[in-house]
Design a protein with these regions (language model features):
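Helical element adjacent to the flavin cofactor pocket in flavoenzyme catalytic cores
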Residues: 67-125
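Active-site-adjacent "gating/activation" loops or surface patches in catalytic cores
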Residues: 46-79, 311-315
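Hydrophobic, well-ordered secondary-structure elements that form the walls
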Residues: 136, 170, 231, 259, ...
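A glycine-rich dinucleotide-binding beta-alpha-beta segment and adjacent secondary-structure elements
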Residues: 41-55, 204-212, 265-326
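C-terminal segments that line or cap access tunnels to active or ligand-binding sites in enzymes
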Residues: 173-283
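Rossmann-like flavin
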Residues: 1-61
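A conserved FAD-binding loop/helix module that cradles the flavin
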Residues: 322-345
Length: 349
């Protein structure tokens, strides 16, 4: 609760007994050495440290505090919503509508009306005007500033971004008995591929990949006798010198080759429908540098040093999403929504 579940306005807010305990446990040391201190099997070392990649840093550079992600996975398990991940926002919307919230879909905010330090109305691409007492904004922060609020603050311009990824969503006729719902397939290389991804900003020569099979536990997510696959390969973000318009077809074939070499025999031939998302697609969806994991969780972009959820220079503009506090990931983003609401109506009792 001290570090994630509340609004933090200053590093001084963290000066609690829990901070002292965290320091004593080595939470501000590096993740990989800390994991290696307790786990000696190289396979387990990977399992309990790879999550740093999604925070935008290598396990060798990430803070040991991020071991909490693997801890939660191990102790609490990994949950899957019936109906797929989209069931979560559908349920949230239904609960909000029950309490009088009105949603306007397929409509984009293109400009804001301002009066001094307050935003007074949002204007959509359809010419609709919505007056507001306060406004919560959840696009990536650089996009919000450049396209809606005005001059981008220097603190936002200086942000360093996480790697990106390519995803392949597949409808397939192929079933594999040896796989689970969530599968992580590590390459033989470890430190080297993180250097490729983060420092050299090149494609990983021996990638570690995620394969999720939603239909493994929810048969409604694929036709009878079929399977649905979500495949994720980490890649550099758009700071890299990669022309994804040209690279995408070749990389799609490389992804299939890697999958087939990792035990998914005949994967390519069994594809019946597919959708590929590259860093260019993430950028088109409003994600700075084509980075779906937002700004990296380096030390000075974590906790109180991460961009606050209050817009500087405005009295009634609040942020939510992975680019602000507390950070990246579905649980964090859900918490960010509540923290944004608390900025407007006060702390939830």
């Amino acid at each position: 609760n001290d570090f994630i579940d509340r609004n933090i306005d200053s590093p001084l807010n963290l000066l609690t007994p829990n901070l002292a305990r965290l320091i004593a446990l080595g939470g501000f040391r590096k993740l990989q050495p800390k994991v290696n201190q307790f786990l000696k099997d190289p396979r387990l070392q990977k399992v309990y440290s790879f999550q740093a990649m999604y925070a935008g840093v290598s396990p060798q550079q990430a803070l040991a505090i991020y071991a909490v992600i693997a801890y939660m996975d191990s102790v609490n398990g990994v949950f899957f919503p019936k109906g797929g991940m989209h069931a979560v926002p559908r349920a949230l919307a239904a609960a909000a509508e029950k309490h009088g919230v009105k949603f306007v879909y397929n409509s984009s905010v293109t400009s804001l009306e301002k009066n001094g330090s307050r935003v007074t109305a949002a204007i959509t691409d359809k010419g609709e005007r919505y007056e507001c007492d306060a406004i919560v904004m959840n696009p990536d922060l650089p996009v919000v500033w450049k396209e809606l609020l005005g001059k981008e603050p220097l603190s936002i311009k200086r942000l360093k971004y996480s790697p990106s990824c390519v995803t392949l969503l597949v409808g397939s006729s192929k079933h594999y008995d040896h796989v689970a719902h969530h599968n992580i397939h590590f390459g033989d290389s470890w430190d080297g591929v993180f250097d490729e991804l983060i420092k050299k900003k090149t494609l990983m020569s021996d990638p570690s990949v995620l394969v999720t099979i939603p239909s493994h536990d929810d048969k409604s997510l694929a036709p009878a006798g079929k399977e649905s696959y979500y495949v994720l390969f980490p890649t550099p973000n758009l700071d890299a010198d990669i022309d994804w318009k040209k690279e995408a077809p070749r990389y799609r074939n490389e992804m299939i080759r890697v999958l087939e070499s990792r035990g998914y025999e005949g994967f390519g031939d069994a594809i019946e429908t597919e959708s590929m998302t590259t860093p260019l697609d993430w950028q088109a969806r409003g994600m700075e540098r084509g980075a779906p994991f937002a700004s990296a969780h380096t030390f000075f972009q974590t906790g109180p040093f991460r961009p606050r959820n209050i817009a500087a220079g405005f009295d009634n503009v609040v942020f939510a999403g992975s680019g602000t506090q507390p950070g990246v990931g579905v649980p964090m983003v859900l918490i960010s929504g509540r923290l944004a609401a608390e900025r407007i109506v006060g702390p939830v009792k």
